[in-house]
């Protein structure tokens, strides 16, 4: 059996293979609730043959949205809508379902990407006041409000409340978004966190909010639900968050009972220098994988089945996340199975579609 199609687990959640769909914002929600677009989109992904689909960043508060069209889990109406979506998917797919909970921080209040994606001033329609650990703008965005201690404690509770709703909605996996320059990442990085109190300064201070959120969340959420964290392993800045700090953070999270770490990079600064190329983030995942017993997910320009197989077969990571590639090619796992001489589960409605040369592809 190929390594890519071997079963594995994250926490107590069993997965049928090592292929994961990462969170990818669709910017198509209404008042934070999934729409017909989400229902079709996630059903399609769940029928692709992957083991886990992670629903896009869902804001823990309205002002934590990237755009006004983001999903949310800040109220029970959204929870019920998510629950209905998951129930419909599970009628036809055995894929595990997760959700990423997030706060966009100083990168919130922006226009839809296909309308330019620019920052929207708080006084303009679909705009609001952004927040951050320090009053430092992202690029040319509006200057954020620096959170007070009381407001930081509120953010912590908002993440925990969103996780409780995610559990009630029926998600198998909860992912805390601490990457890509959003609020929790802003606290981690010395390039965006200039605080002089207990939430800034040294490594312990900058990681305090994330580790406190995780610790309290893990204590209250059923252990049958896996909880992981997505991080940017480096800011790609000389003065920013870096790989050694990511390794140290991973060790802290592992001690607190974290079930996996999802390793991305960048997003904090417009000055970042990212060396884009196939597998460009895999060495980051490998560096963390070598220093933890937790499962590690690699992501970023992983596009070919043999490439993905090599990553997991050589223990650079335990799982691969296929993002834009699976949007372009929604049956990517089918192609991977055919190229690796594996069989793959499909919905019975699709069993007759296998080409003659792959007549044994489907289980």
Where are these regions (language model features)?
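Flavin-dependent oxidoreductase catalytic cores
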Residues: 1-363
